[in-house]
Each structure stands twice: as C-alpha cells, then as structure tokens.
Amino acid sequence: MSNVKLISTSSPDLIADIAYMARVSNPANQSNELTSRKLVEYLIKHKHWSPFEMCGITMEINTTRDIAHQIVRHRSFAFQEFSQRYADPAALEGWPYELRETRLQDTKNRQNSIETDDALLQQHWIAQQKRVIDTASNVYKWAIEHGIAKEQARTVLPEGLTKTRLYMHGTV
C-alpha cells in the first residue's frame, strides 16, 4: 500500500504566506494575518491558484515502482527516487515487495478496476504474485552473488511488486 508523508514546507505558516502573496497589489494590508484563512478559502473557491505557486512542499512517497512511474510523469514537480542502481531494494525497511489486491477490469471504463469478492481468485492471484517474487528474488540474488552489476540485476525485479521511495517537491 502506498503512503505519503509531509517532509517539509517552504514556511512554517503556509496560510499566512499564501495570503501575503495574494495581497501583492494591496501593500497596506499585506501583513494582515487576521483574515489570512478567509482569504485563502476565497482563493480556493474562486480558483485563484497563482498565490499557491509561491509556496512549496516536499513529500516522501512509499509505493511500488509502477505507481512511481505514473507519479513522475507530472512534470510540474521535482523528484528524487530510491536508486536500485546503487542499492538493493531490501535496503528499504521491511519486505521489499508489495502484493497487489485482486481487482477486475471494469467493462465500462478501461481506466478503472473493480473489487472482487471471489475468494478463490484472490488466493490464486496472491499465489501467482508470490511465485513471480520468489523467482525474481532468486535470480536477482544469484546475479549479485556472481558479480552482475546491480543496474543489470535489477531488471529482473517485477516493476509492479517492487517497493520504492521517492521525494516529490513542488508548489502548493
């Protein structure tokens, strides 16, 4: 399961900073923090986003490599990802793999999947994933033990099951 943790913000009081930026054309009232929250709510309601772009956040995202690839396509952010070229995925705490839930293809929306309550299918899906992980893990370990470079050995690891960590920085 993916999880996200806030690492840092560009300021200890983002609300006050966003309001300050929004009041650029009203210098006499620019430092008024009493109405900052109300102003930020107004900006959101009326979709005035430019003041939010003045403040930044950095988040830590723990997910699988296939989801990470989808995230990094958003080019308005800067990314730093755990490198399997230099480190073994086992360096991330816990088991370096994540078993995926059993979901069926939605027949009406190809970009959607739906839950299933088929217990037998779920058992088989978990067993198949474990077989892939066992095989890939053994091949990866064999490659490392035989001097194969990590950057080459990592190619056998399953993208959708192998965990990764990335840091994402962008504007609020």
State where each predicted segment sits.
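Family-specific signature for flavin-dependent thymidylate synthase
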Residues: 1-172
